[in-house]
Regions:
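Glycine-rich phosphate-binding loop of ATP-dependent small-molecule kinases
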Residues: 1-341
Length: 341
């Protein structure tokens, strides 16, 4: 896939000036139309050229209406993020329907970790499967994903870094990480190809952008976003599905798992007290052990017996230390919550 972005695509100054004004207007108009749509737009910018990716993020913030765009740059995970599920910071950055999120960074860091031996092949495969699952959830919920991978050949990157080092005007853009990344670029290539293949899904393919020429790069990125968004906005809203009332007619006898629950089960009070005390003591010690090991536990309670759920929760929390748990009641989604995935 990367070879397709090494053919020498360029855009002259005159060509650039001819297409940019209309392209910018089209991008902003598409953003305005998106405001009334029932889906969000997520633009993912990744690549093996950090400087190019940074420039593209800045360019999109210049060309698009930032009132309806939120940019999230994912650097090294903070201590708080390391204590959370692996994609927690992505969950927090999801846009509501009708808005756009620009995500940058994070993906190539995982590739570098594989190349440097910090992450095993098995761990990388697990990470990919979780990322595929998240992508599938977003697509099934209607999100439009535009995924851009910026590629600059190692030879061109090396020449650019050398020029920047000599020139005071551009030298500040370069840091030691860029030189270190350049040394592992060839080793990273098969890992990148694997990531791009695994994460290319129907409706959400990767667009590999040749980033050597900045004019070609910026126009290609903006045009890809514009074309994907306008095409999606032009689609007819899905027609409602007619469902026969017979589907909801009560059957003579519906056997489910709940039909087999023994509602007459009970304990004598003395036996209940003894067993409850023993189990609460065991739960208390397990919770302390989990705290020391950094193990997180989520308990989900569902059912039509609200008093029963509340009673169970109270008896569990009685055995825990107050700082170790949080009870979160979940009601029907609010209108604001319904705007998000």
């Amino acid at each position: 896939m990367l070879a397709a972005a090494e053919v020498g695509n360029r855009l002259s100054k005159d060509e650039y000036r001819a297409v940019v004004p209309d392209l910018r207007v089209g991008l902003v108009n598409a953003q305005y139309d998106l405001r009334n749509a029932d889906f969000p737009l997520i633009v993912l910018v990744a690549g093996d050229d950090r400087i190019a990716a940074n420039a593209v993020v800045n360019r999109l913030n210049e060309w698009m209406d930032t009132r309806y765009l939120r940019t999230h740059v994912f650097r090294e995970p903070t201590p708080e993020e390391q204590d959370r599920p692996r994609f927690w910071r992505l969950w927090k950055s999801m846009p509501p329907r009708g808005r756009t999120a620009l995500w940058a960074g994070g993906l190539f860091r995982q590739v570098a970790a594989v190349v440097e031996g910090e992450v095993s092949e098995r761990e990388f495969d697990t990470w990919l499967r979780h990322l595929e699952a998240l992508q599938g959830d977003l697509l099934n919920d209607g999100a439009l994903l535009v995924k851009l991978f910026l590629h600059t050949p190692a030879k061109e990157q090396r020449a650019r870094l050398k020029r920047a080092k000599k020139g005071a005007e551009e030298g500040w853009r370069v840091n030691p990480r860029d030189w270190a990344a350049l040394e592992t670029l060839d080793d990273a290539r098969p890992v990148v190809e694997r990531l791009l293949r695994r994460m290319s899904a129907p409706g959400a393919p990767w667009t590999v952008v040749e980033a050597t020429d900045q004019r070609y790069r910026d126009v290609t990125v903006a045009r890809t976003i514009h074309d994907a968004l306008t095409a999606r906005l032009a689609e007819d809203a899905p027609a409602g599905v007619e469902v026969s009332p017979k589907l909801f007619a009560p059957a003579a006898e519906q056997i489910t798992v709940l039909s087999k629950v023994d509602l007459s089960a009970s304990l004598e009070r003395d036996d209940y007290r003894v067993r409850l005390d023993a189990l609460q003591a065991r739960l208390h010690h397990l919770s302390l052990k989990a705290r020391r090991r950094g193990v997180t536990t989520v308990l989900a309670f569902e059912g039509w017996d609200a008093a029963g759920k509340g009673g169970v929760i109270r008896r569990i929390t009685q055995s825990l230390e107050a700082g170790d748990y949080r009870v979160i009641p979940t009601a029907a989604p609010t209108p604001e919550e319904l705007r998000y995935h």
